[in-house]
Amino acid sequence: MKKYVCTVCGYEYDPAEGDPDNGVKPGTAFEDVPADWVCPICGAPKSEFEPA
């Protein structure tokens, strides 16, 4: 699974880790992250992420 990076702040979404503090379980591919999920650092929408 590919990692994705927030183009606003540089936060890296790692599918192996997910974002459990915000309801995304480890092992969740970026494509399967809910559409309303936002960057946990800066609040940017999912659309601001690109493949690492």
UniProtKB/Swiss-Prot annotation:
InterPro entries hit by this protein: Rubredoxin, Rubredoxin-like_dom, Rubredoxin_dom, Rubredoxin_ET, Rubredoxin_Fe_BS
Details of cofactor binding: Binds 1 Fe(3+) ion per subunit.
Residues found modified as N-formylmethionine: M1
Keyword field contains Coiled coil: no
Protein's cellular compartments: Cytoplasm
Keyword entries, A-Z: Cytoplasm, Electron transport, Formylation, Iron, Metal-binding, Transport
Domain of life per record: Bacteria
Keyword Cytoplasm: yes
Principal location class: cytoplasm
Role description: Rubredoxin is a small nonheme, iron protein lacking acid-labile sulfide. Its single Fe, chelated to 4 Cys, functions as an electron acceptor and may also stabilize the conformation of the molecule.
Assembly description: Monomer.
The protein's name in its UniProt record: Rubredoxin
Annotated organism of origin: Nitratidesulfovibrio vulgaris (strain DSM 19637 / Miyazaki F)
Gene name linked to the record: rub
